[in-house]
């Protein structure tokens, strides 16, 4: 009789745990932002960590913020995640660290007038060397890896976080 009494709470506990895990697995994007400990006012990505947010700019009525991904906002309270991975190349031996982005209104980089140009750290996993690379976009969402990367290479293990500026400086407030 003792064995049966112990089995019932164990079975109920297992069912309760399974139901909880199942409900958690079915979370949608609306419920993500109601999670405990998730910032409710400042931006946080749907999954993963944001690292160093960079490439913040105001352009054509929207705030644009880049990290490894991209979000847009019209009021700095409500955000639309555009992509979780904005800047990537095709080499699996390369990781990308943050940098900055700018709108090239005068086509000084040669990617087209009004192109988004992102500068970031290119990290070679095997050698641990860091260099600076760029990607460009004509819509601010789909970036093209510049085939001439790296654009600055000191062959150093400590060469991170480039900052670019231009005619489109960040506007806050």
For the regions a language model picked out, list residue spans one by one.
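Bacterial N-terminal signal peptides that target proteins for export
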Residues: 2-12
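Beta-rich carbohydrate-recognition and catalytic domains
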Residues: 26-173
């Amino acid at each position: 009789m003792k064995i049966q009494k112990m089995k019932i709470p164990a079975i109920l506990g297992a069912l309760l745990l399974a139901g909880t895990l199942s409900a958690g697995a079915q979370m949608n994007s609306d419920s993500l932002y109601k999670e405990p400990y998730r910032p409710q006012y400042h931006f946080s990505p749907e999954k993963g960590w944001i690292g160093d947010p960079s490439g913040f700019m105001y352009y054509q009525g929207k705030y644009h913020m880049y990290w490894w991904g991209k979000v847009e906002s019209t009021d700095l309270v409500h955000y639309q995640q555009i992509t979780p991975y904005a800047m990537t190349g095709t080499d699996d031996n390369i990781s990308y660290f943050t940098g900055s982005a700018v709108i090239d209104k005068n086509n000084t980089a040669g990617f087209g007038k009004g192109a988004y140009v992102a500068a970031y750290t290119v990290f070679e996993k095997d050698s641990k060397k860091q260099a600076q690379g760029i990607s460009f976009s004509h819509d601010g969402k789909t970036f093209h890896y510049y085939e001439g990367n790296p654009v600055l290479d000191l062959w150093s293990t400590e060469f991170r976080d480039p900052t670019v500026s231009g005619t489109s400086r960040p506007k806050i407030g």
